[in-house]
Amino acid sequence: MIELPVSIPTPDGTADGYLYRHESSRPLAGIVHLTDIHGVRDASRGMARRLAEEGYTVLLPNVFYRTRNPPMFDFPVNFGEERTKQRFAELTQPLTPEAIARDATAYVDFLRREKSVGSGAMGVVGYCFTGALALRIAAARPDVIVAAASFHGGGLHTDAPTSPDLLLPEVKAQVHFGHAFEDRSMPAEAIAKFDEALAAWGGRYESLVYDQARHGWTVPDSAAYNRDEAERAYANMTALFARTLGGSAS
């Protein structure tokens, strides 16, 4: 597996990140792998590398490039403390729906320019805060994104006029949403409303509550990491990508 640091040009600046390229000489489907709120680090690099080993070219962008380069938190993270809340706001506020749409095209176009990427369909996966970003990217580039996955994604349904689920009519991808059974950012009531939106949409989807999982369960360096449920989530994600993109998992 080849890991390359990359600079991704966007209309709003340059996003740093990594590209994971299989040693195979044939072009492979591209996947955009979005990190959780903690950004690009050893854990997320390992997750992206593992996915690439399934037979894909994977782009791991620093989605918070407008604010800072890694690490996202240069102090102990405690979401009950003001400085953590302030940093969270600094990282997320620039990611407006319009900014995410611009980034979507930048990431897709970057992958398309890579010789290791085929000219066809792509996928996207997001975790935590970026679960909603994965949905927004699928809506922004329905011409390319045929598979989207989200794990412990927060705020997929809100009462705001910019709620991510309102974009479902724009999405042509098959989607998988994995929810935690205990998640303040996506409580049971919000999951129920989100499932109603998915059913009304009429596309091909999976929306599952991982019964033994808390928010952050898929990420190896998370305090909530649950190996068994993380492996279940990984199997569901790779099955989605195998159905839609091929890869060695097919």
Show where each model-derived region lies.
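N-terminal cap/leader regions of alpha/beta-hydrolase-fold enzymes
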Residues: 1-250
